[in-house]
A protein has these predicted regions:
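Conserved ABC ATPase "signature" region
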Residues: 91-106
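Hydrophobic anchor residue at the start of the ABC signature
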Residues: 123, 162
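Q-loop/switch helix immediately C-terminal to the Walker
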Residues: 68, 73-92
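The feature captures the beta-strand-to-loop junction immediately N-terminal to the Walker
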Residues: 30-32
């Protein structure tokens, strides 16, 4: 990432973000709610267009897990997983189901699941996608302590397999060599125009 600006509408809220992320590395984004972590992740995922700066990802397959679980509530857990498997062209998801301990709820409609169970089903999309780069926005939301430990284990395994992760979280990660980024270092008043924004840095 080189000299990246992130926008809400026409106004930049983050500026001049630069960092390198290699295979097997994890970056943790820190900052209070509303500081721009979600906007940065969506920009990295190209959901929000890049207006200024560069994102060079060497054509890495990327999977974004946001605040929303993106589940079809009237379908069963298995039907949701099968839907994602078809999208990502992954014919075998049995190991992913087992890893997340979803076997017992495969035939349960998602609507009947607890918040924590829904989050676990959503996490399965990361494994099913086989993406090298995971962009995670508070992925441990609604998870209990045991499942947070499971999430840490899954992330550590992904890194060992030469994956890469950028995560926004308020939790302490039990993973070695986390590279922290304080997002508030790049924060600007979102009511400042781009011309005012750049002029402010030039001062």
């Amino acid at each position: 990432v080189e000299n990246l600006y992130c926008f809400r509408g026409e106004f930049p809220i983050l500026a001049r973000i630069s960092f390198d992320l290699d295979y097997g590395q994890i970056i943790s984004l820190h900052g209070p709610n509303g500081s721009g972590k979600t906007t940065l992740l969506k920009t990295l995922a190209q959901i929000i267009p890049t207006e200024k700066g560069k994102i060079i990802n060497n054509s890495l397959e990327t999977c974004l897990m946001g605040h929303e679980n993106c589940l079809k509530l009237d379908l069963t857990v298995f039907e949701n997983l099968k839907f994602w498997a078809d999208i990502y062209k992954n014919p075998s998801i049995n190991s992913d189901i087992s890893t997340l301990g979803l076997v017992q709820i495969l035939d349960v409609p998602v609507r009947q699941l607890s918040a924590g169970q829904k989050r676990k089903v959503s996490l399965a999309r990361l494994l099913i996608s086989k993406s090298k780069l995971w962009l995670l926005d508070e992925p441990d939301a609604s998870l209990d302590e045991d499942n947070r430990k499971l999430l840490n284990k899954i992330m550590a395994s992904h890194l060992l397999e030469n994956g890469a992760i950028i995560i926004a979280t308020h939790s302490t990660l039990n993973i070695k060599n986390v590279l922290p980024i304080d997002i508030t270092r790049y924060k600007r008043d979102e009511n400042t125009s781009i011309d005012q924004f750049v002029h402010g840095f030039q001062k």
